[in-house]
Amino acid sequence: MTEYVLLLIGTVLVNNFVLVQFLGLCPFMGVSSKLDTAIGMSLATTFVLTLASVTSYLVNQYILIPLDITYLRTMSFILVIAVVVQFTEMVVRKTSPTLYRLLGIFLPLITTNCAVLGVALLNIKEDHSFLQSAVYGFGAAVGFSLVLVLFAALRERLAAADVPTPFKGASIALITAGLMSMAFMGFTGLVKF
């Protein structure tokens, strides 16, 4: 049990996919201008990352390895991710039309979020078990969500702040992301892998 807790904490804080591994930067910068949209994107990405991580593990273990077609791993994982995203899109459209409209184009773009594919491929590289894959996917999603929501809250505060003209927009956003990354470096050494 301790192993899974350490894996979760390590994935969320120490090896954060956005701030440490630089995966998922497109939605991080694109959806983080409003807190409501960031929360919705976080929920959708959490669902997709966790489900895609587990599904990719199953596809790898029970289809690709037995048939000796592991060279199709990346293509297979992209297909699995696309199916999971389409399923998520249908669920969000039925349950929350407002959130569906708010997310707009970003919901289908989860398919191309490199963090989702990165989690699936890193599960294989790290030789995780089924449960470890689920925890790793969930931890990556929680870390992504945490950073996205914090960054969106900071950007809303920055929109109301008196920022010098040369730093407005993407400039101050990148500086803020860099400061967040340095803050997360403080968690280095918290969990040893």
UniProtKB/Swiss-Prot annotation:
GO terms for biological process, alphabetical: electron transport chain
EC category name: translocase
UniProt keyword terms in alphabetical order: Cell inner membrane, Cell membrane, Electron transport, Membrane, Translocase, Transmembrane, Transmembrane helix, Transport
Lipid bilayer topology: Multi-pass membrane protein
Residue stretches spanning the membrane: 5-25, 39-59, 63-83, 102-122, 134-154, 171-191
Cell compartments where the protein resides: Cell inner membrane
Source domain of life: Bacteria
EC number(s) given by UniProt: 7.-.-.-
Any one GO cellular component localisation term in the record: plasma membrane
InterPro entries for the chain: Ion_transpt_RnfA/RsxA (IPR011293), NqrDE/RnfAE (IPR003667), NqrDE/RnfAE_oxidrdctase (IPR050133)
Assembly: The complex is composed of six subunits: RnfA, RnfB, RnfC, RnfD, RnfE and RnfG.
Function: Part of a membrane-bound complex that couples electron transfer with translocation of ions across the membrane.
UniProt name for this protein: Ion-translocating oxidoreductase complex subunit A
Organism: Pseudoalteromonas translucida (strain TAC 125)
Gene name of the record: rnfA
